[in-house]
Each structure stands twice: as structure tokens, then as C-alpha cells.
Amino acid sequence: VTINVNYIYKENELIYLLDNADAEAVFFQGCYSERIKAIKDQLPKIKVYIQIDDGTEPLMEGAIDYESSISSSKEQKRFDRTEENIYMLYTGGTTGMPKGVMYKHGGFIPSMLKTAFAMGFEVPEDISDLEKIVKNAKENDSLSVSLPACPLMHGTGMWLGAFLPMFSGGTVVTISDLGLDPKKVWEEVVKNKVNSLVIVGDAF
């Protein structure tokens, strides 16, 4: 079960969040390595740290390089999910520390599909219909090209900005810069012909 982590959290918030989630693996960009170093000794449940090289810091001692871990890994057997499997999203902690909200796949996925329908997406009756729907949308040049202008650790950014387009064969455009740069956002909109811009005003 993966969880979202707010990139602006300080050490005490990160310790609480990762401990509360019973996290066993942490993926982090190199620019956050100093913050991770400062808390790793207080997180005994973490079994592995995987660092994504962003050109800012050398590989943290004890961490595994993300790209190397992929290239050296063997193909894993596929395992089936059930409706009882959990997807967990941590709240923003505006009324105390963040809370882990658990959604069963059997309830979350139908809810997302209903949202997709309300937004104009064609929802398949059966998974076997999905390929046809995506093919038709591509031929009609109506596939979603979404830019989540709010952080992906926010539910709105992840659900509306990323999940829905991916569910329907669309494209998700991301911006590598932290924070909100309106000029950069509009440059990406024009460059990638974005037709869905998702934003939350106070989530930066």
C-alpha cells in the first residue's frame, strides 16, 4: 500500500507520518536526503530507502539508487487485487496531524468511475470495453491531456489530475519545479495541448 507524503513536511511531521503508516520503504528525491538522514534513525520499521537522482545530492549512505534498482530487478509475478485491498490517502493535517484515510478498492474505484462519467468520460460497462473506448477517443482526438497544477500528494491532484486520465487512456503532464509558477504552467498547457487543468488554491 503506497501513501502520499507532503514534500514540505518537516522532520517531526515525517516521523509521525511514516511511523503511523507502518511504512517499510521510502522513495525520495535526492534534494530531500538531508531531511531523510535526520530522521532515519528514529524510524526502525523502514527496511529500505530508495533515492531518485535529481542531480542535487550524492546517493545517501545506506540508500538504493532508484534507476539501478529497476534495471537490476527481475520480472515479478503478477498478483491479483481484490475489492478488499486498501488504498490509503493521508489528509493535509489542517486540524492536527495527518490522518490516514483508508478506502477499499471495491468502493473507491466505482466512485472514481462515477466522477469520470460526471466529467464527460465514457465509462465502460466491463473492463473488456475499455480498449474500444480508448481507441474511439484517440480516433476522435478526445483523449484527456491533464495537468495537475496542484501537488500530487493532494487528493484532488492525484484523483482528478492523474487517476481519471490514466483510467481512460489519457495523458498526465507533470511539472518538475516545486511550487506554483503560473508562467511555467501555461507554457506546458500550450506545449502539450492540455485540455484539463486541475488546481487547488492553497495546497502549495
Residue ranges and their predicted role:
Residues V1-S68, D80:
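Structural core segment of the AMP-binding/adenylate-forming
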Residues I3-Y16, G30-Y32, V172-K191, G201:
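ATP-dependent adenylate-forming carboxylate-activation enzymes
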Residues L17, V26, Y49, G169, ...:
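Residue-level signal for inorganic ion chemistry
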Residues D22-E24, D41-D53, Q76, S144-L147, ...:
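Conserved helix-loop-beta element of the AMP-binding
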Residues V26-A38, D54-G55, C150, D177, ...:
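Adenylate-forming
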Residues S72-G92, G96-M97, K135-V145:
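Conserved pre-ATP/AMP-binding loop-to-beta segment of ANL
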Residues I86-D126:
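Conserved AMP-binding A3 loop
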Residues I109-A149, M153-S196:
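Conserved AMP-binding/adenylation subdomain of ANL enzymes
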